[in-house]
Amino acid sequence: MARYRRHSRSRSRSRYRRRRRRRSRHHNRRRTYRRSRRHSIRRRGRRRGYSRRRYSRRGRRRY
């Protein structure tokens, strides 16, 4: 029993370390993706000629 407990403890420790690093990386990646997507949408809207009021309304509702 003691041996199993010891093993699980070390395993969880390594897992936590890995998880933490992976999580931060994923979060950063997600943020950049969202940002880039938003910018592209804005550019597209300006090019097409969407009304400013409509765009602002959409953005407000989204956030």
From Swiss-Prot:
UniProt GO BP = chromosome condensation; sperm DNA condensation
Query: What ranges does the record give for the region Disordered, renumbered to this chain?
Result: 1-63
Protein localization: Nucleus; Chromosome
Presence of the UniProt keyword Protein biosynthesis in the record: no
Listed A to Z, the keywords are: Chromosome, Developmental protein, Differentiation, DNA condensation, DNA-binding, Nucleosome core, Nucleus, Spermatogenesis
Taken from the UniProt entry, a GO cellular component term is: nucleosome
Q: Report what the protein is called.
A: Sperm protamine P1
Provide the species name.
Sminthopsis bindi
Gene symbol? PRM1
